[in-house]
């Protein structure tokens, strides 16, 4: 207990006095190397890493910064690799004791803390300047890829691995492009066999980061298309929507992200109508987060036809959305009104109202 309190105090000191603590970096690194011997709570250990990373962030020499980040990551990668080496070729795993040195999540969360809090130059690295963390993240990818493969049946480890990848991608943005193809290929294959919704969530992060690059959009749309069949398979069985609200939430978040970042290519896909049909069925789901994602999808879909009127693609977007509204508008409003009256709780009414208002703005006469 005392060790955890001391670690928390040290974290606060690192955060408040970064400039003064920079000269003690090597000493802090030695503490990180011994952290598993201190019997710290996971939160305290992660906080300690956060404090050290804050100090690294103010280093002005990019080479020194990159070297410091790599050293912190190696301290976590070494035990993580040792744990994975204990998994047999047949996939048999030694028992994982949560929050112990046998738990890969312990080290994945620490890596997440590194990439979540590292901010070279205050977080503003120019696009044409190599990110100091790029080499470390590219070197780390084989380890994370292996973790996804080895622990594919363990949703807890898979979620934490995806979380680490998410923060790594957010850290260096489009400079992680070398990882995009192998990452998407592995995500698609593993989602087809295991259908963990965290892959859908990670997919939405990739869309957010890469959809601004025109050359990446076809591959991202192919990723979404590959996700559709496994998603429909688990949602279409009796009780599937109720049993898998996280999948509903993450699937429609992913689709909404395309509407926000690459609306025209998304609106032109052949599979969009099937997504709309799935959304209509999902709109009656009484689950706060899942229902909110479905409504956000409907809202973003309709709003895409009116948003950014000065943009060059506005006329194309408007035409595509009008065609969809003409086919689905009445059915959508009817479904939402019935669901609000008979099934859904009052906390959904605001989102439902926003969707219906967008429908009215498109064609008030038809919907009277």
Specify the residue positions occupied by each region the protein language model found.
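Karyopherin-beta/Importin-beta family HEAT-repeat alpha-solenoid scaffold
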Residues: 1-368
